[in-house]
Design a protein with these regions (language model features):
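Short, surface-exposed linear patches
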Residues: 21-23, 82
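Membrane-interface starts of transmembrane alpha-helices
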Residues: 25-29
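Active-site-proximal catalytic alpha-helix in oxidoreductases
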Residues: 1-20, 31-44, 63
């Protein structure tokens, strides 16, 4: 559905903005984010694992990944995505 594409693009936009906020150039940040999203999709398509199983493979206790994921969850990432999906159906 086109709304799903827009939601995914909103994540891409936010991640690019984050890269710029960290001091990178917009063009480089966009290339990194697009390759990251492409890699995640290809990984899930190739092995059929649940996304959480793949997240667990790249997450270590106290590491950068878990710290970032925890911050996103504390800010309501999953809830915001679910609420957005539901709002689109009202």
């Amino acid at each position: 559905a086109s709304c799903g594409i827009a939601y995914a693009m909103r994540y891409v936009r936010a991640a690019v903005e984050g890269g710029v906020d960290l001091g990178g150039s917009g063009m480089i940040a966009e290339k990194i984010v697009l390759q990251t999203v492409k890699g995640a999709v290809e990984l899930l398509q190739a092995n059929g694992n649940h996304p959480e199983a793949e997240i667990d493979k790249v997450t270590t206790p106290g590491g950068v990944t878990i710290k970032g994921l925890n911050e996103m969850e504390h800010a309501g990432f999953t809830s915001a995505v679910i609420r957005g999906l539901k709002a689109g159906l009202k």
